[in-house]
Structure formats: C-alpha cells, structure tokens
Amino acid sequence: MSSYMHPLLGQELHLQRPEDSRTPPDQNNMELNRSEADEAKAETTPTGGATSSATASGSSSGRRPRGRPAGSKNKPKPPTIITRDSPNVLRSHVLEVTSGSDISEAVSTYATRRGCGVCIISGTGAVTNVTIRQPAAPAGGGVITLHGRFDILSLTGTALPPPAPPGAGGLTVYLAGGQGQVVGGNVAGSLIASGPVVLMAASFANAVYDRLPIEEEETPPPRTTGVQQQQPEASQSSEVTGSGAQACESNLQGGNGGGGVAFYNLGMNMNNFQFSGGDIYGMSGGSGGGGGGATRPAF
C-alpha cells in the first residue's frame, strides 16, 4: 500500500509545482501594471488639478450670492429737512387769555403786532358782559348786552391786521347760561373773559381776496413758464394782509404798474415767492401805472 501511495503523492507534489512556479509571474504582472498606472496618474495629475481649480473658480465667480448683503436691511434713511417755509403755511397756536381781558381786543392786538392773520378754531372757558349782534332779531338785527357768567360752547372767527377792512374779520360765539339757555351771535363789542380762556388758533401770512363767481373769458389767459402766474381780471384778486413792521415791502412785479404785492414775513425769507398782482387794500403804490386808481372791491 505504501508503495502505491508514494507514487500518487509524488504526482500531486509534481502537479503543484507548476502552479507555484506560475504564481510569481502573475504577481510580477500585477506589480508592473500598478507601476504603469501610477506613472500615468502622476503625469496627468498637474493638468487635472489645474482644470478642477479653474472650474471651481469659474463657478464661484459666476454664481450669484443668495440673500441680501450684510447690513443692507437696517440702513439709516437721510432725514427730510425743510429749509424754507411757504408764505401760505398755517401755524397752529394755543392762545390763553387772562381773566378780565377782552377776548376780541386781545386777538385783534395779537394779529396786529405779529403782522399775520389769525383764525380762531375753537375756545373753552367762561365769559361775562357779552355784547353780541343777533341777525334774527327784528329790524335787521339788534345789539344786546348779556350780563352774568356764561360758558363758551363755540368760538370761531378771524382777525386780520391793517390795512384789511374791519368787515373782513370778526368773532362768532355761542354761550350757555346758568339756566340752560343757549344764546349766540356775532361779537359786536366786549367779550370779557371770566377766568382763563384757551383758544385754539392758526396763523397765516398771506391771504388773497377773490370775488366769486369767476366770469368766463372768451380767450384763456396765456400760460407762463415761470413761478409767477397772472390771474384773470374778472376774479379781482387782492391781498387782504398788507405790509407791517415785519412785512416784505419789495415790489415783486418789478415796478411795471401791476400793483405792489406785500405780505407778512413772519421771520422767514419770502423774496423768492411771487404772487399775482392786484389791488392791496390801502397799499396800492402810486408809482405804478394803474395801481393807484384801482377801487377796492366790496366784501
């Protein structure tokens, strides 16, 4: 048996030897292929890196960033600064009339000294010794004097400084008596404050008088390209407020006979504002061609 197994083992060992002998060439081939692949990769690596970097830079430069830029949401806005006031602006005032003073006289004096028109919007307080004119009374209205203390329900009116006529302004008051009676009318005399009286008022520097209705003209007036615009003669526009201590007395029409235009300055430069010409009550310049002989329109 041993003699029979020995040749078989010898054949198996002999058959395994060629396999062992063929293994090293395969390993050599694999190593050779690896070395060639490494060399090829080493040769192509610089070019490939440059291409990838160029592609990355191009994509980053061409891509638009998402979202708003940093700090753009809360940027401070520049403040709005008004460096010059308009001559037609209204200024609000709270006027307090002391006890024992005549409200009508106090408002008129305030308008004259300040050189502006005053519009009384409302009033609160109590008055005594009221002289009013009631239009509903017989014979075209009568003047009555009320003695006693009355509470102000409503007080409105205007006060214009000279040279405006007295009929252009005035006060209207409605009062409540102690027994619940209500009386009112145009203030025709004294209106004495019985305690502090607070008035809400608005002042204006310029007021233009227009007579209505405006008659239609056959040909429309020519349009001007500048700031100054002439009004049609049918409207008979005139300045109600004239020149006072603080008035701008310069003739904005250039002395061409169009009539002087004067208004109260109120401490602001209004030489750059131009208004239409017209007859100013009592202030028409005699040097103009037709300003001196114009008649004052009736209220």
Swiss-Prot record:
GO terms under biological process: negative regulation of gibberellic acid mediated signaling pathway
DNA-binding region, residues: 63-75
Compositional bias of kind Low complexity: 44-72, 224-239
Pfam families: PCC (PF03479)
Keywords tagged on the record: Activator, DNA-binding, Nucleus, Transcription, Transcription regulation
Residue ranges with Polar residues bias: 240-251
Tissues where this protein is expressed: Expressed in seedlings, leaves, stems, floral tips and flowers.
Basic and acidic residues: bias regions: 14-23, 33-42
This protein's record includes keyword DNA-binding: yes
Start and end residues of each PPC domain: 87-233
Compartments reported by the entry: Nucleus
GO cellular component, one term: nucleus
Main location as per UniProt: nucleus
Presence of the UniProt keyword Transcription regulation in the record: yes
GO terms assigned for molecular function: DNA-binding transcription factor activity; minor groove of adenine-thymine-rich DNA binding
Stretches the record annotates as Disordered: 1-87, 216-251
Known partners and oligomeric status: Homodimer. Interacts with AHL27 and AHL29.
Domain remark text: The PPC domain mediates interactions between AHL proteins.
Main function: Transcription factor that specifically binds AT-rich DNA sequences related to the nuclear matrix attachment regions (MARs). Binds the DNA sequence GNFEI (GA-negative feedback element I) in the GA3OX1 promoter. Binding to GNFEI sequence is required for GA-negative feedback regulation of GA3OX1.
Protein name: AT-hook motif nuclear-localized protein 25
Protein's organism: Arabidopsis thaliana (Mouse-ear cress)
Gene (UniProt): AHL25
